[in-house]
Amino acid sequence: MEQLPNGYSDYYVPDGFERNREQEFERAENFLHVYSSKETEESYTVRCSIIQPGQQSLFDNEHTTYENVKVGDADATLGTSASENGDTVYILSWEQGGVSNTIMGNISRDEIMKIAENVF
């Protein structure tokens, strides 16, 4: 695969969040979308890229707790850690159809999972 499938994107945005187009990028082979809420000061990113041969995921084991979860039918890894100011930060990673997907943010676990289920 040389580029993301046509129309591949994230299709669910929680209430109160706006996309920050200045901090993001979109290319044929990958994208990064950045969202934030002015009200709650929460934010998250959605990063999707085609899987490159030999690509490895690096995980921070020292400060993050990992568990196996499902995103649809795909096996996923959900990491939980704390930011410098004590907020809970989640990082969810999974692969589907030759695409590596990562969502990271200080939003609720339920919202992270709902966003993930609407990436296609």
Please report, for each region that a protein language model flagged, where it lies by residue.
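Short, solvent-exposed recognition patches
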Residues: 1-96
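Surface-exposed amphipathic alpha-helical segments
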Residues: 97-120
